[in-house]
Amino acid sequence: MGVEGLLEKGFVTTSADKVINWARTGSMWPMTFGLACCAVEMMQAGAARYDLDRFGIIFRPSPRQSDVMIVAGTLCNKMAPALRKVYDQMPEPRWVISMGSCANGGGYYHYSYSVVRGCDRVVPVDVYVPGCPPTAEALIWGIMQLQKKIRTTNTIAR
């Protein structure tokens, strides 16, 4: 009996983990934390040419409505506490994408006294998107990597 036979009878069997993770990957709501030129590429990814809506990704203005934070750009020492505060306001489960060389490790400003050498020193990062600035395609690749990571996580303790 194939899937067609099961659908005719009105039921499908699966695990709760798979259903929950499928729903989470199909409705990711990122909050933009644009700090520099990478934010322009992030905005371009949400525009009509790339259309992140087809992946179920809708940008949210509030951290309380988001489950993904995209950190795009140079993180300075004065902005680090604000980043942590916004991250703490996000509901669980939450994920972070670090976009661009500056967010990943400080970029060109790595040795500056006022730059945090990677946002992973402030918040836990799930996916790193390389580039300076990374293209919209690279951000979409990073989002797809995060979706792959979410699909393989266990949501229910065993």
UniProtKB/Swiss-Prot annotation:
Q: Which UniProt keywords apply?
A: 4Fe-4S, Cell inner membrane, Cell membrane, Iron, Iron-sulfur, Membrane, Metal-binding, NAD, Quinone, Translocase, Transport, Ubiquinone
Could you tell me the Gene Ontology terms of the biological process aspect for this record? aerobic respiration; electron transport coupled proton transport
Q: Does the keyword Transmembrane apply?
A: no
Catalysed reaction equations from the record:
a quinone + NADH + 5 H(+)(in) = a quinol + NAD(+) + 4 H(+)(out)
Protein residues bound to [4Fe-4S] cluster: C37, C38, C102, C132
Compartment annotation: Cell inner membrane
- The record's gene field reads nuoB
Q: What is its EC number?
A: 7.1.1.-
Q: What is this protein called?
A: NADH-quinone oxidoreductase subunit B
**Entries under InterPro entries matching the protein:** NADH_UbQ_OxRdtase-like_20kDa, NADH_UQ_OxRdtase_20Kd_su
User: Whose protein is this, by species?
Assistant: Alkalilimnicola ehrlichii (strain ATCC BAA-1101 / DSM 17681 / MLHE-1)
According to the entry, what is the taxonomic lineage of the organism?
Answer: Bacteria, Pseudomonadati, Pseudomonadota, Gammaproteobacteria, Chromatiales
- What PANTHER family is this protein classified in? NADH DEHYDROGENASE (PTHR11995), NADH DEHYDROGENASE [UBIQUINONE] IRON-SULFUR PROTEIN 7, MITOCHONDRIAL (PTHR11995:SF14)
Binding note for cofactor: Binds 1 [4Fe-4S] cluster.
State the annotated membrane topology for this chain: Peripheral membrane protein
